[in-house]
């Protein structure tokens, strides 16, 4: 999705926030999700911070892969779907702040991204590039001292049959998320007013 489209989607989410907050529970997973999906290993809080920096490169490499199997494609698809559920990683603190209402869903898409990267180590055409990314991640983690950092979601495994949603009901308790969504809602409202004013003279002149 292009940046403008993502901004519009964020603004729409912000405008619908009261409805979302009223109808979702803490880190609610999709109702009725089966347990027949593929399990995705947990990711530590420290790993998240580094893998988030390499996510675009990992997904781009995976998307170009030709000789893939169904499990790989399912995990890749889950990583991208979960990323959109987590507002494309745009919410402040979603990766680094354990208290963020978006932290668990960030764990989900980054755990899936890591699983995709690990799978590419065994793929003939992608193995070299995947190995280079893994080495860079290992170096970054050691340099930043993130290897042993954990949080409440660090031991949580995920499943491709279950989408992790943000904890909308906790957004008002998280200042950074609340400020971001409030600002986007205000921007969306202002854009609507400007659009109406631009159209009004044209409508009057056509009468």
Give the positions of each predicted feature.
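Cytoplasmic C-terminal tails of single-pass
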Residues: 200-207
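Selective detector of the "anchor" transmembrane alpha-helix that sits immediately C-terminal
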Residues: 171-200
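Soluble mature domains adjacent to a membrane tether on cell-surface and organelle-surface proteins
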Residues: 25-161
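Hydrophobic secretory-pathway targeting helix
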Residues: 1-38
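Short, aromatic-rich amphipathic segments at membrane interfaces
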Residues: 150-180
